[in-house]
Amino acid sequence: MDRIICVVGPTASGKTKLAVQLAKLYDGEVVSCDSMQIYKHMDIGTAKPTKEEMEGVAHHLIDMVEPGEDFSAGKYVQLADSCVQDILSRGRTAVIAGGTGLYVDSLIAGRSFAPVPQTGRREALETQLRENGGEAMLARLRSIDPEAAARLHPADEKRIVRALEVYEETGKTITQHNLETQAIPPRYRPVWLGLDYSDRAVLYRRIDLRVDKMLEDGLLDEIRALLALGVSPKATAMQAIGYKEFFGYLNGACTLDEAAALCKQRSRNYAKRQLTWFRRNPDIHWLRLMGTEDFSEVLSAARQNIPFSAF
């Protein structure tokens, strides 16, 4: 088993706090596995750990990319794998923490991704999408890769375009590409720890309180500052939960209470999707929390599932 600990679970479950304490105990460094904390200038809405919360523990893959830039799972795997290799080479523990399931699974599996398309290919497909619509593009994908098409809806425009460009670029369907990469043995053998709450209402309450705290901490000013920097509301980073829900309020289309309620609901729905994703992994040791226990109890329960020694 590699000296790697993966701390996963839904949003607002306490992953950051546990990861920091485990890193301190096991001479580790934290590798963020959050698709939005990778962006600069987006601190409050992505719940980035503060310097105080980091407690002197080195954190990687936070504040790496400008919010107007595109970022992908493939790029994440390249950066994160380099971080993990460096940490392990120094005899330390890599604590991978976050809730972006595709990222962490791809990193641990050592999954390769289809190559970036040639210049102009994606733009051509996006033009065809605008001219013909999602239904027509999905029908085209169905004739090439019926399995991939069956998993998509006409509104899944980015995924339809991606599936088509993979086929045009490689001559292989995205389904075939995924099957080939899944057949490769995992790159790493980590300890998996998952955080969840026995009473779902406790998790939802934590999510609601987090949104309230974000607003108190200046989330609206953060969004205004991003827009002032010229970041498009349609940019991938700005489509994150915690940002796009407040565009309506800033444009005068709804009240702040309505925007906050929408953000809370979407965050709860996201938490459900995260749990569904991670529960497919039989290697995760789940820590079922009540929400009333002392953190030392959570840490003790986590340590019982870690086979290597602390420092």
Where are these regions (language model features)?
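Phosphate/pyrophosphate-binding catalytic cores of soluble transferases and nucleic-acid-acting enzymes
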Residues: 1-311
